[in-house]
């Protein structure tokens, strides 16, 4: 019989908020008796935007802005029904995007 696994992928712009949410998920899963692998840091995606500083002239004068998207991966191995219930009731921060695959 194959073992069950829940894969949770977290994304956020703030790395501290992301690590805090990952810690809450790990703590909840371990408390309910499941094994946890992670959080595994995935590569940070950096989107850069270059704009002209002046609205009219000076093409050489530019400014760059960037958005960093931090990602973490968690694997919950052999989850129990109690683990699933606890994860569904877990209230995470609004700035963290959670994707769950089973």
Curated annotation (Swiss-Prot):
The keyword Ribonucleoprotein applies. Signal peptide: none annotated. Keywords: Ribonucleoprotein, Ribosomal protein. GO terms for molecular function: structural constituent of ribosome; tRNA binding. SUPFAM superfamilies: Ribosomal protein S10. The keyword Nucleus does not apply. SMART domains: Ribosomal_S10. It comes from the Bacteria. GO terms for cellular component: ribonucleoprotein complex; ribosome. Pfam families: Ribosomal_S10. One of its GO terms (biological process) is translation. Involved in the binding of tRNA to the ribosomes. Belongs to the universal ribosomal protein uS10 family. Part of the 30S ribosomal subunit. This is Small ribosomal subunit protein uS10. It comes from Myxococcus xanthus (strain DK1622). The lineage of its organism: Bacteria, Pseudomonadati, Myxococcota, Myxococcia, Myxococcales. The gene is rpsJ.
């Amino acid at each position: 019989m194959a073992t069950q696994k829940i894969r949770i992928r977290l994304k956020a712009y703030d790395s501290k908020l992301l690590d805090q949410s990952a810690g809450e998920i790990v703590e909840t899963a371990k408390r309910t008796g499941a094994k946890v692998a992670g959080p595994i840091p995935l590569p940070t995606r950096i989107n850069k935007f270059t704009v002209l500083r002046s609205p009219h002239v000076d093409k050489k004068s530019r400014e760059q802005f960037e958005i960093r998207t931090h990602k973490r991966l968690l694997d919950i191995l052999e989850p129990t029904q109690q683990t699933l219930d606890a994860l569904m009731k877990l209230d995470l921060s609004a700035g963290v995007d959670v994707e769950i695959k089973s």
